[in-house]
C-alpha cells in the first residue's frame, strides 16, 4: 500500500514548501487551522479564483497575508484592482483581521498538476472523451519539459454501469524518491452519470532539498 501516500505531504519540509506559514501555541493552533480552512474554501468558491492553483497563508502580528497562485492574474485582480479590493474586504469580514492579498503568476500552467487536473475535469464535463482529454493533456505536459506524467480517471467512465479506473503514464514518475520534484493534484468532474475523479502526477525532475533543516519541526517555518 506504499502508493497511497500523498506526494505533496510526503515531500513537505524536504523539497516542498509549507502552504501555511505561521506558528501557533496550544491555545491558538486549532483556531488558526480552522481559519486557514475557511479562507481556502471561501477562495475556491470565488469565480475570480477559479483558475487558481493554490493558496499560501502567512500570519504576522495580527495580520494575514494570502498569496493566490494563478495562471490568470488579470481575472483575480479585476478592472483597476476592483476584485482584489473586494477579496480583501470579504476576507476581513470572514476572519476579523486585516488581510493582504498577493498575486503570484504561474508562468507555465502546463507543468502545474492542479491546473492540468482542472482542465481535464472541465473537458469531461463538456462531454469530451476522457481518453482524448487525458492524452492531449499528457502531450502538453511532456512538450512543456516534464520528465514524466501520470493521469488517472475514476468513476462511471463513458456512462458505464460499473465504475472503474483508467490511467496513462509517460516518462518517469517515482513515488518514493524524495529528491524527485513531484507535483500532484486531484479534481472532480460532475457529469450526468455521477462524479468522475481526476488525479495528476507530474515529475518536474530531481531537486535538491530546500528545507532539510526544517524536517521534524513541530510547526511551519517561514521560508
From Swiss-Prot:
Gene3D superfamilies per UniProt: 3.30.300.20, Ribosomal protein S3, C-terminal domain
GO biological process: translation
InterPro entries: KH_dom, KH_dom-like_a/b, KH_dom_type_2, KH_sf_prok-type, Ribosomal_S3_C_sf, Ribosomal_uS3_bac-typ, Ribosomal_uS3_C, Ribosomal_uS3_CS
One Gene Ontology cellular component annotation held by this UniProt entry: cytosolic small ribosomal subunit
GO molecular function annotations of the record: mRNA binding; rRNA binding; structural constituent of ribosome
Disulfide pairings: none
Domain KH type-2 residues, every copy: 39-117
Keywords recorded for this protein, A-Z: Ribonucleoprotein, Ribosomal protein, RNA-binding, rRNA-binding
Domain of life: Bacteria
Subunit note: Part of the 30S ribosomal subunit. Forms a tight complex with proteins S10 and S14.
Protein family membership: Belongs to the universal ribosomal protein uS3 family.
Function: Binds the lower part of the 30S subunit head. Binds mRNA in the 70S ribosome, positioning it for translation.
Identification of the protein by name: Small ribosomal subunit protein uS3
Gene for this chain: rpsC
Amino acid at each position: 500500500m506504499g502508493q497511497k501516500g500523498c506526494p505533496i505531504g510526503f515531500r513537505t519540509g524536504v523539497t516542498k514548501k509549507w502552504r501555511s506559514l505561521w506558528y501557533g501555541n496550544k491555545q491558538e493552533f486549532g483556531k488558526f487551522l480552522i481559519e486557514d480552512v475557511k479562507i481556502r474554501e471561501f477562495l475556491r468558491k470565488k469565480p475570480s479564483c477559479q483558475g487558481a492553483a493554490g493558496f499560501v497563508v502567512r500570519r504576522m502580528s495580527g495580520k494575514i497575508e494570502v498569496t493566490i497562485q494563478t495562471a490568470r492574474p488579470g481575472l483575480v485582480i479585476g478592472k483597476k484592482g476592483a476584485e482584489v479590493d473586494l477579496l480583501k474586504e470579504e476576507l476581513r469580514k470572514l476572519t476579523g483581521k486585516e488581510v493582504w492579498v498577493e498575486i503570484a503568476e504561474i508562468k507555465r500552467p502546463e507543468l502545474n498538476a492542479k491546473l492540468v487536473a482542472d482542465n481535464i475535469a472541465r473537458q469531461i464535463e463538456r462531454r469530451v472523451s476522457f481518453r482524448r482529454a487525458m492524452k492531449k493533456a499528457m502531450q502538453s505536459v511532456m512538450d512543456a519539459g516534464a520528465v514524466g506524467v501520470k493521469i488517472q480517471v475514476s468513476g462511471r467512465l463513458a456512462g458505464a454501469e460499473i465504475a472503474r479506473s483508467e490511467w496513462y503514464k509517460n516518462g518517469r514518475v517515482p513515488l518514493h524518491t524524495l529528491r524527485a520534484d513531484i507535483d500532484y493534484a486531484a479534481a472532480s468532474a460532475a457529469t450526468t452519470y455521477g462524479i468522475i475523479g481526476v488525479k495528476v502526477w507530474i515529475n518536474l525532475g530531481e531537486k535538491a532539498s530546500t528545507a532539510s533543516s526544517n524536517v521534524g519541526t513541530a510547526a511551519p517555518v517561514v521560508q
